[in-house]
């Protein structure tokens, strides 16, 4: 093979390499309804971040230190989790690897859902449900106390486009993306998927506890 041909193949190879997706440089998450985020999480708290620092968290398979961001927090209320208050939250150092950035100083309150690490610690990623507390609707805030838990045996199925259907009675169809082009639409803000007496699940709207008539009804 001549030098010109080798150069062309090398240039083509570099061009193709440059067009490949760089999965390691991006964080991708599937949208979930706030109730799903609650049910999937080990810990759900209302808290403020007091301080942050970078810490070592062991080594990778090559012996290189693994860095994480440690947030010292002030827990205001625990909606789900261990008996011991959460004192520290850990996350990756960059959003490219799903790390979360919280405002520190103790002024901004968050709803934080994530995975327990034991001994007053938890881990969070961009795929967890972490939002400023004051952006939640009244219904969402009240649902954190009991309502969301009532539907953790239900399945919320996101509808990406019409037509879409449920495949079993214990599903609720989440339509926000179709109707509002947003995952933070009406159903996310004002509805919870509740399991009823007959084992089926249905959307329930409002901040008040579901009445017995709703739980006993056979059809949505």
From Swiss-Prot:
Positions marked as site (Involved in metalloproteinase-binding): 40, 61, 67
GO biological process: negative regulation of membrane protein ectodomain proteolysis; response to cytokine; response to hormone
Annotated GO CC locations: extracellular matrix; extracellular space
Record flagged with keyword Zinc: yes
Disulfide bridges in this chain: 27-98, 29-127, 39-152, 154-201, 159-164, 172-193
Subcellular location: Secreted
Keyword Metal-binding: yes
PANTHER family attached to this UniProt entry: METALLOPROTEASE INHIBITOR, METALLOPROTEINASE INHIBITOR 2
Protein name (Swiss-Prot/TrEMBL): Metalloproteinase inhibitor 2
UniProt source species: Cavia porcellus (Guinea pig)
